[in-house]
A protein has these predicted regions:
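Charged, often glycine-rich, active-site loop that binds/positions anionic groups
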Residues: 26-48
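N-terminal low-complexity, Ser/Thr- and acidic-residue-enriched intrinsically disordered segments
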Residues: 1-26
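A general "terminal functional-core" signal
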Residues: 50-317
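Short, conserved beta-strand segments within well-ordered enzyme catalytic domains
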Residues: 21, 32, 99
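A general structural signal for well-ordered alpha-helical segments in protein cores
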Residues: 4, 40, 72-75
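Acidic carboxylate-rich catalytic motifs and surrounding loops in phosphoryl-/glycosyl-chemistry enzymes
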Residues: 18-28, 264-273
Length: 317
């Protein structure tokens, strides 16, 4: 999509400190942590029924499969970088890292929906839990993951995948009357009315983060930083301003920072009447992320942990 190309161009031009890399493609084995083997095979072999393809929203092609694998793989790479689980002797937790696309939260274990084929947040959460366990063994607590989904649409696929999984907490603020019209119950869902503006939105977010803090202690946050709550979005039906969305991101990044919880984020939805507005919302998120990445690099937190990692600086992915 054009917005992704525009975002890459602006990040390269205006935020040269941000290091980017090609998104790796998630393997069948990695995808199978969140999706059934039968569904993966049907997608990759082009054998999904016509009704299933209509639910996804675009036609099958080999390029679609590759793009979907890489969308999931990019969130995996961001989560690895945030936690410091990437390969190499220079692996150090970045604290904050990103996927310039992703946020495919309508995909469930058995089907895609709403332009989402594979659920990148779910794949990344499960894979990071597995890799964390292999690295640290029984001497460290299992990795708990919070998915903070602030796309305007409820993350129904994510909620369904983790319905019986107490190690992953799903939090979603979304439009009550927006897609999907049949919501899935997550761990914490907050419905917002059409036309919701900055002040009530931020009050709801404060309440949600307070409740998350009360009920769960994550070792990783996966944040879906949707641009579609913006007042100029064609599909969002909410009315947040640029400043309101900056304040939203600030709250999430600060919440994670105060608890020294690494955070990986994906850009998720954004369908502005003016595409430049969508990209500006996303750029604002990147600028804030860079500021928090700097805090992580200046912090002595990771140097005080008993981790078999050799610290060297990394930039957001």
């Amino acid at each position: 999509m054009a917005k992704y190309a525009l975002l890459r161009e602006r990040v390269a031009l205006e935020l040269p400190q941000v290091q980017t890399q090609e998104a790796p493609a998630a393997s069948d084995g990695e995808l199978a942590l969140a999706h059934s083997p039968a569904y993966i095979h049907a997608v990759t072999s082009g054998q999904l029924p016509a009704a299933a393809m209509r639910e996804i929203g675009f036609p099958w092609s080999a390029q679609m499969v590759e793009r979907s694998r890489r969308s999931a793989g990019a969130t995996v790479a961001a989560a690895r970088a945030a936690l410091g689980l990437q390969a190499g002797a220079d692996a150090r937790p970045a604290g904050v890292a990103a996927n310039m696309a992703g946020g495919t939260h309508h995909a469930s274990a058995e089907q895609g929906s709403g332009f989402c084929v594979f659920n990148d947040a779910a794949v990344a959460a499960r894979l990071m839990q597995a890799e964390w366990g292999r690295l640290h063994g029984p001497q460290r607590a299992a990795l708990q993951v919070a998915v903070i989904d602030l796309d305007v649409h409820q993350g129904n696929g994510t909620a369904s995948i983790f319905r019986q999984d107490a190690s992953v907490f799903t939090l979603s603020l979304h439009g009550k009357h927006n897609f999907p019209f049949r919501k899935e119950a997550g761990d914490l869902d907050m419905d917002l009315p059409d036309g919701c503006t900055d002040t009530p939105y931020l009050q709801a977010l404060d309440e949600a983060l307070f409740e998350l803090d009360r009920r769960f202690a994550p070792g990783l946050v996966i944040y879906l930083a949707g641009a579609d709550p913006f007042e100029g979005d064609r599909l969002g039906r909410l009315a947040l301003s640029f400043e309101g969305l900056k304040a939203r991101d600030q709250r999430v990044f600060e919440w994670a920072w105060q608890r020294r919880v690494p955070l990986a984020f994906a850009m998720a939805g954004g369908y502005g009447v003016n595409i430049d507005d969508t990209v500006q919302v996303q750029m604002n998120t990147y600028e804030l992320a860079l500021a928090y990445w700097r805090r992580w690099q200046q912090s002595q937190h990771w140097q005080n942990q008993e981790m078999s990692l050799n610290p060297k600086p990394q930039h957001p992915t």
